């Protein structure tokens, strides 16, 4: 049987994880900041889900801040993060910087509405899922059906997050669609651009 899994295409980049066990990142957790700075994979998703649950248990009323600089990756791993964000009580504010591509884009726009931020020189990429095709004809058909189902689910959620129609999302994610920070704001992926330290600093400190 073919071991094929649907993914969102990953943009080329450094394969070295962004220091998930580094003391600096652990220190950020004390301020309720989670750093997502690598390809979305199962081990990374498990870590972020655990951090979300831990911070929610520590204070269910205080916002959690998810910083995203990611080329995308596994849909199933990304959806585990998404589902955890929806299940916990605290609002999850998202801050995109650098590149938010594929699943990185989806998680950025999945933050609590009104609390989705993007730095002024960040870039956002939206496109549809893809998967490796191999194995028997039945395997190929099953994998294709899985990809189409995931495309529908993610497109429906993205339409809800951005205020666009499903038809508009299907049109715009058919091929690689890059957005500047301003274009991402206009499209509805985020609610505000980060132009000064106070843009998000006051929100983090004033909860």
UniProtKB/Swiss-Prot annotation:
Keywords: Cytoplasm, Hydrolase, Protease, Serine protease. It catalyses: Hydrolysis of proteins to small peptides in the presence of ATP and magnesium. alpha-casein is the usual test substrate. In the absence of ATP, only oligopeptides shorter than five residues are hydrolyzed (such as succinyl-Leu-Tyr-|-NHMec, and Leu-Tyr-Leu-|-Tyr-Trp, in which cleavage of the -Tyr-|-Leu- and -Tyr-|-Trp bonds also occurs). It is found in: Cytoplasm. Pfam families: CLP_protease. GO terms for cellular component: cytoplasm; endopeptidase Clp complex. This is ATP-dependent Clp protease proteolytic subunit 2. Fourteen ClpP subunits assemble into 2 heptameric rings which stack back to back to give a disk-like structure with a central cavity, resembling the structure of eukaryotic proteasomes. CDD domains: S14_ClpP_2. Cleaves peptides in various proteins in a process that requires ATP hydrolysis. Has a chymotrypsin-like activity. Plays a major role in the degradation of misfolded proteins. Belongs to the peptidase S14 family. Its main location: cytoplasm. Its EC number is 3.4.21.92. The active site is at residues 102, 127. The keyword Transport does not apply. It comes from Bifidobacterium longum (strain NCC 2705). GO terms for biological process: protein quality control for misfolded or incompletely synthesized proteins. GO terms for molecular function: ATP-dependent peptidase activity; ATPase binding; serine-type endopeptidase activity.
